[in-house]
């Protein structure tokens, strides 16, 4: 646990020092590799490094500029501790120092704060794909849409056919052969077939898992880019 806490502190810092070279390496975020190992991503755009495994047996993880949460089989782990949770993976919607969490195996929503979970009485219809405060991306028989906890519709995403990630002020989603980043009234598309998952890697990047590799998608407006990550791809 101590090693994990130190790693989280490093990820939240502005820079890391790469001990072997003495070079300051900016922290990008975290990914879960094909073995279920949590690994830090460091470097600069187009030149990334995957750090050593910090935790094994990870089913899900998400990071923002303030918070990283990890789901093992039966716990949610943070930089400050851990709490018991339903078995299986989790979908995280991070907001400041809190998060909304969805547990697919029991179809239950909860609010995470200070290493405790409060069950929510949300009864959202359809397959939950992503969460942000008070909004949920779901797949239903008529397609993918964003809804409120009472199931009222906010917006349809007619182009989406694969994974979806709700951002604070936008959305990333997959079509059959593209990744679409939509925010600030604009849209950027990248070629990417066979997308399996889209997760929050850090404050400025999301992780795209597709056909045996992981990409880092930079989401900063005006600097949108898609980069292939090195190393242990799924």
Kindly give the residue locations of the regions a language model identified.
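Bacterial N-terminal signal peptides
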Residues: 5-16
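Repeated scaffold domains used in trafficking and secretory/extracellular systems
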Residues: 20, 56-66, 85-98, 122-134, ...
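Beta-strand-rich domains and repeat architectures in extracellular enzymes and scaffolds
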Residues: 20-64
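Short beta-strand elements that form the blades of beta-propeller/WD-repeat-like
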Residues: 26-33, 66-71, 97-103, 133-140, ...
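Surface-exposed loop/turn elements that mediate protein-protein interactions on large endomembrane-trafficking
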Residues: 39-52, 74-87, 106-122, 143-158, ...
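Short, intrinsically disordered, low-complexity segments enriched in Ser/Thr and Pro
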Residues: 59-79
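Recognizes the extracellular SEMA beta-propeller fold with strongest preference
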Residues: 93-96, 102-104, 112-113
């Amino acid at each position: 646990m101590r090693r994990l806490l130190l790693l989280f502190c490093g990820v939240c810092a502005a820079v890391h020092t790469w001990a072997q070279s003495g070079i300051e390496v900016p922290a990008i975020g975290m990914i879960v590799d094909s073995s279920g190992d949590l690994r830090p991503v460091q470097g600069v755009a187009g030149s990334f490094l995957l750090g050593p495994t910090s935790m094994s047996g990870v089913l899900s993880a998400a990071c923002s500029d303030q918070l990283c949460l990890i789901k093992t089989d039966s716990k949610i782990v943070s930089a400050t501790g851990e709490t018991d949770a339903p078995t299986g993976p989790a979908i995280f919607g991070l907001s400041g120092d809190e998060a909304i969490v969805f547990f697919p195996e029991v179809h239950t929503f909860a609010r995470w704060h200070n290493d405790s979970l409060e069950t929510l009485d949300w009864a959202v219809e359809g397959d939950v794909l992503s969460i942000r405060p008070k909004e949920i991306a779901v797949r239903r028989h008529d397609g993918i849409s964003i809804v409120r906890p009472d199931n009222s519709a906010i917006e349809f995403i007619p182009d989406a056919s694969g994974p979806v990630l709700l951002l604070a002020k936008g959305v990333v989603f997959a079509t059959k052969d593209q990744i679409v980043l939509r925010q600030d009234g604009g849209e950027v598309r990248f070629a990417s077939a066979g997308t399996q998952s889209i997760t929050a890697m850090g404050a400025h990047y999301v992780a795209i898992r597709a056909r045996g590799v992981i990409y880092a998608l930079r989401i900063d407006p005006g600097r949108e880019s898609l980069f292939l990550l090195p190393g242990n791809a799924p």
